């Protein structure tokens, strides 16, 4: 009766090499699939936020939600920061679901990472006037919510090259517009291409889409026909 032949060292090394090659081929594909799933989930969250804002606007005679109001936040506030911020102002439509306000691509859900257009559409504290839907010339092209973060290269002219500062650990719930200097440069919370070559965006009319940050027109001044961050 023949005895079973044991693997030689060379055969074992060949098997290990084959496994390593297969893993090298599969892992990038799995990583891309995971990133795509995160981007889709983020877009779904953005859609729910967009619908909630439409609901809020309808209930408030066409007025947009403010970035933050100078009123005490609710006991179960999503953002217990002293004032009441837009995620809590939209609680009637969304409920207290913190995951909706967070991009799944971020490791820490408390980073949120979905921001409101500020100050062009979302005002800070109380102002003499409110932004209303009737103020928006092109609701279908005007971005109100999007992937946001604090940049480490705010003086970069090409928005597609903006990179989030890895040292920043705080939440990001707004993105600044170019008419918000000096804070636009000094505290550069902005839209960025979090999902490969695109950022997820929600528009005033309620629709959502993935778009390059450069296509939103942050390289253009207020009033430019390709500045899709302003009201004009």
What is the predicted role of each segment?
Residues 37:
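Phosphate-proximal small/polar/acidic motifs at interfaces that engage nucleotide phosphates
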Residues 40-232:
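Short, well-structured segments within or immediately adjacent to enzyme catalytic domains
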Residues 2-3, 59:
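Short alpha-helix boundary/capping motifs
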């Amino acid at each position: 009766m023949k005895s079973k032949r044991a693997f030689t060292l060379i055969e074992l090394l060949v098997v290990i090499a084959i496994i390593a090659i297969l893993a090298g081929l599969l892992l990038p594909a799995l990583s891309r699939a995971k990133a795509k799933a995160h981007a889709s989930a983020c877009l779904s969250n953005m859609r729910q936020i967009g619908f909630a804002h439409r609901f809020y606007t309808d209930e408030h005679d066409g007025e947009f939600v403010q970035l933050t109001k100078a009123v005490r936040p609710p006991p179960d506030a999503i953002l217990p920061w002293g004032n009441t911020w837009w995620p809590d102002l939209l609680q009637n439509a969304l409920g207290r679901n913190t995951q909706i306000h967070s991009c799944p691509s971020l490791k820490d859900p408390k980073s949120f990472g979905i921001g409101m257009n500020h100050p062009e559409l979302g005002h800070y504290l109380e102002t003499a006037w409110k932004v209303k839907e009737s103020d928006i010339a092109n609701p279908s092209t005007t971005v109100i919510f999007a992937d946001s973060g604090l940049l480490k290269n705010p003086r970069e002219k090409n928005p597609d090259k903006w990179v989030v500062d890895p040292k920043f650990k705080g939440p990001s719930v707004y993105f600044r517009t170019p008419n918000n200097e000096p804070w636009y440069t000094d505290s550069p919370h902005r839209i960025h291409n979090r999902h490969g070559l695109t950022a997820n965006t929600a528009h005033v009319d309620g629709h959502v889409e993935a778009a390059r940050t450069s296509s939103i027109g942050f390289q253009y001044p207020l009033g430019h026909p390709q500045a899709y961050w302003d009201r004009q």
